[in-house]
From Swiss-Prot:
Residues 15-28 have a biased composition (Low complexity). Residues 405-422, 476-496, 559-623 are extracellular. Forms a receptor-activated non-selective calcium permeant cation channel. Forms a heteromeric ion channel with TRPC4 or TRPC5 that has reduced calcium permeability compared to the homomeric TRPC4 or TRPC5 channel. Also permeable to monovalent ions including sodium, lithium and cesium ions. GO terms for molecular function: store-operated calcium channel activity. The lineage of its organism: Eukaryota, Metazoa, Chordata, Craniata, Vertebrata. PANTHER family: SHORT TRANSIENT RECEPTOR POTENTIAL CHANNEL 1, TRANSIENT RECEPTOR POTENTIAL CHANNEL. Belongs to the transient receptor (TC 1.A.4) family. STrpC subfamily. TRPC1 sub-subfamily. Activation of PRKCA induces phosphorylation of TRPC1 and subsequent Ca2+ entry into cells. This is Short transient receptor potential channel 1.
Length: 793
């Protein structure tokens, strides 16, 4: 029987001496008895073994013959092999679809057959199984399928529902078949949900509950499922990536899994955008507004470019989507507008253009103020020209700050309340203009979006300091009219406080130029790296301050006890020769000494320990504390900071192009709208365009209360709805094209991989096996059903 089951094995040349001896012929210390401790199932009969072997070899005629001869029912058609696979499972794994149909017709059952077919991605088997299942009166839900599949009597090996498994495999064809069965998916609850269902599941099995949530999100993040079930796949990918990123911060045990799913959603949105073939499709995608977003009715009627989808991508931090080549090309076109020829000019002409606009920016601003709708005004309205004009205005403001320090009057140095100079009034005009610009951005963007930008935060702090400076100067001028030496002034005199705030505001004003580096492909990545390093330094600061505070408390408590006079403080503990050493007798002094010691700015003699007879123990403890501080901070924490900064820089350098393009897009978007066209201080002057808008809005409001006005308003709303519906239809048409191209590109990638080659080999093997069995059956080579066990020589 052994030779029959394993015909390729030759045991004739194996001597009995080479085989291991039985345990009975050897001592117990020389052999180890092996015993199967697992559940032993009933041994299959010879017919059952033949039945399973025929299914494995894909012999359709032999399987059919065995099933036809099983009229008495002696053969268990649901028998399993040593691996726990029944005939249906074996047939699915071998992709023998004709045998699968035959087995199902004869009533072979398998609880996890559909799961095996989905896991093996055998589309034909899934189609056969779904069509063979009896129709039910009620719609099956995923919860019911889960309960049925996870029933212990089925002994299934997969703890997942069919549609979830198909989504995990990202198989578009199988998902299409399953969704036609009217299945549903349970909506995942939040991590901290305290509803009755979540509390019961979490109490019963918290691991299963967390794993089920992860499986659901794996299903929802499947690109194939998103394309099939969502009308707006890009928006759904944005929302899912944000939810998954939030989940990765809450469920830290599965952080890597959730981060990988979030990355998958981002890459899907990027790849879908990459399928756009012309500017018209890009314009439809990037300007699409979802139903939940606020609409600009005037911009919609005037067919203005709002780029709402691109703004949403920046809000959701979709760096891959924004930095995609098609998106960047479209942004470049919008950025230069009517000055598209600027990019093709030589470098010298580019510099001359920028310098000319930078010098004559007041004249250009006045021209736009007078005639904003003219051809010249439209050129100024392009984002690139707005950027140059706003930059020139800010450089003029910095020049005024430098002039302010140069024209400082020494005669008024001791004046307690000096009057404002002419240059002060010019600075106030600029500051009011910058504040008005920030107020308009705050109004249109909202507080949350406004504060997300570090550039807006810096501008807010800077303008607040300037306002406080000039307010204190006005207070000092109205309250103080005397002259006195500065050393006699109060420490918090309004003039002194104003000068301090003004100095700090000047520092921030120049640091604000860093954000202009974002437009440069050379300086931009460096500016982004510096921002990331500052964030990492903030994390390091929390650890460093704790260590500094700990050692400061210890040294202060050690050296400030029992000493009240300077004579007693001389030469005590850690010693400083020839000068009074009271460094560690106060909290502030100890903190300063330990801080500056990191930069080698503290005198070395401070940390020399003097051992005397009376203070030997105290001096030794102080030396140990300072030595430990030296090791922990100077050696360990400082090197840790260097490693953190190097890691941050390397992380930005590895994704330099993506990070820079994303930061540049954020800067460019702030110049795309028509809310802040004029720079400070011209933006505080009411323009004719603003006056016309106000008059038009007022007249519309007045006319809306008349009968003709109401009819006109209804017609306008109807026109707006029709235009919105037309835009939505165009978006759906473009999205269908993108999905079709995406599926085609994915299919081409699959055909070029090794996996596709293996599938082709499997198909070829099945065809050859089928052909062999048909030839044998026709020629009558198989005279007995046991010929598979006893092949002819």
């Amino acid at each position: 029987m052994m030779a029959a089951l394993y015909p390729s094995t030759d045991l004739s040349g194996v001597s009995s001496s080479s085989l291991p001896s039985s345990p009975s012929s050897s001592s117990p210390n020389e052999v180890m008895a092996l015993k199967d401790v697992r559940e032993v199932k009933e041994e299959n009969t010879l017919n059952e073994k033949l039945f399973l072997l025929a299914c494995d070899k894909g012999d359709y005629y032999m399987v059919k013959k065995i099933l036809e001869e099983n009229s008495s029912g002696d053969l268990n058609i649901n028998c399993v092999d040593v691996l726990g696979r029944n005939a249906v499972t074996i047939t699915i794994e071998n992709e023998s679809l004709d045998i699968l149909q035959l087995l199902l017709d004869y009533g072979c059952q398998s609880a996890d057959a559909l799961l095996v077919a989905i896991d093996s991605e055998v589309v034909g088997a899934v189609d056969i199984l779904l069509n063979h299942r009896p129709k039910r009166s009620s719609r099956p839900t995923i919860v019911k399928l889960m309960e049925r599949i996870q029933n212990p009597e089925y002994s299934t090996t997969m703890d997942v529902a069919p549609v979830i498994l198909a989504a995990h495999r990202n198989n578009y064809e199988i998902l299409t078949m399953l969704l036609k069965q009217d299945v549903s998916l349970p909506k995942p609850h939040a991590v901290g949900c305290e509803c009755t269902l979540c509390s019961a599941k979490n109490k019963k099995d918290s691991l299963r509950h967390s794993r089920f949530r992860l499986d659901i999100y794996r299903c929802l993040a499947s690109p194939a499922l998103i394309m099939l079930t969502e009308e707006d796949p890009i928006l759904r990918a944005f929302e899912l990536s944000a939810d998954l990123k939030e989940l990765s911060l809450v469920e830290v045990e599965f952080r890597n899994d959730y981060e990988e799913l979030a990355r998958q959603c981002k890459m899907f949105a990027k790849d879908l955008l990459a399928q756009a073939r012309n500017s018209r499709e890009l314009e439809v995608i990037l300007n699409h507004t979802s139903s939940d977003e606020p609409l600009d009715k005037r911009g919609l009627l005037e067919e203005r470019m709002n780029l709402s989808r691109l703004k949403l991508a920046i809000k959701y931090n979709q760096k891959e989507f924004v930095s995609q080549s098609n998106c960047q090309q479209f942004l470049n076109t919008v950025w230069f507008g009517q000055m598209s020829g600027y990019r093709r000019k030589p470098t010298c002409k580019k510099i001359m253009t920028v310098l000319t606009v930078g010098i004559f920016w007041p004249v250009l601003s006045l021209c736009y103020l007078i005639a904003p709708k003219s051809q010249f005004g439209r050129i100024i309205h392009t984002p690139f020209m707005k950027f140059i004009i706003h930059g020139a205005s800010y450089f003029t403001f910095l020049l005024l700050l430098n002039l302010y320090s140069l024209v400082y009057n020494e005669d008024k140095k001791n004046t307690m309340g000096p009057a404002l100079e002419r240059i002060d009034y010019l600075l106030i005009l600029w500051i009011i203009g910058m504040i008005w610009s920030d107020i308009k951005r705050l109004w249109y963007e909202g507080l949350e979006d406004f504060l997300e930008e570090s550039r807006n935060q810096l501008s807010f702090v800077m303008n607040s300091l300037y306002l406080a400076t000039f307010a204190l100067k006005v207070v000092a001028h109205n309250k103080f009219h005397d002259f006195a030496d500065r050393k006699d002034w109060d420490a918090f005199h309004p003039t002194l406080v104003a000068e301090g705030l003004f100095a700090f505001a000047n520092v921030l004003s120049y640091l604000r130029l860093f954000f202009m580096y974002t437009t440069s492909s050379i300086l931009g990545p460096l500016q982004i790296s510096m921002g990331q390093m500052l964030q990492d330094f903030g994390k390091f600061l929390g650890m460093f301050l704790l260590v500094l505070f700990s050692f400061t408390i210890g040294l202060t408590q050690l050296y400030d006890k029992g000493y009240t006079s300077k004579e007693q403080k001389d030469c005590v503990g850690i010693f400083c020769e020839q000068q009074s050493n009271d460094t560690f007798h106060s909290f502030i002094g100890t903190c300063f000494a330990l801080f500056w010691y990191i930069f080698s700015l503290a005198h070395v003699a401070i940390f020399v320990t003097r051992f005397s007879y009376g203070e030997e123990l105290q001096s030794f403890v102080g030396a140990v504390i300072v030595g430990t501080y030296n090791v922990v901070v100077v050696i360990v924490l400082t090197k840790l900071l260097v490693a953190m900064l190097h890691k941050s820089f390397q992380l930005i350098a590895n994704h330099e192009d993506k990070e820079w393009k994303f930061a540049r897009a954020k800067l460019w978007l702030s110049y795309f709208d028509d809310k802040c066209t004029l720079p400070p201080p011209f933006n505080i002057i009411p323009s004719p365009k603003t006056i016309c808008y106000m008059i038009s809005s007022l007249s519309k409001w007045i006319c809306s209360h008349t009968s003709k006005g109401k009819v006109k308003r209804q017609n306008s709303l109807k026109e707006w709805r029709n235009l919105k519906q037309k835009r939505d239809e165009n978006y759906q048409k473009v999205m269908c094209c993108l999905v079709h191209r995406y599926l085609t590109s994915m299919r081409q990638k699959m055909q070029s991989t090794d996996q596709a080659t293996v599938e082709n080999l499997n198909e070829l093997r099945q065809d050859l096996s089928k052909f062999r069995n048909e030839i044998r059956d026709l020629l009558g080579f198989r005279t007995s059903k046991y010929a598979m066990f006893y092949p002819r020589n």
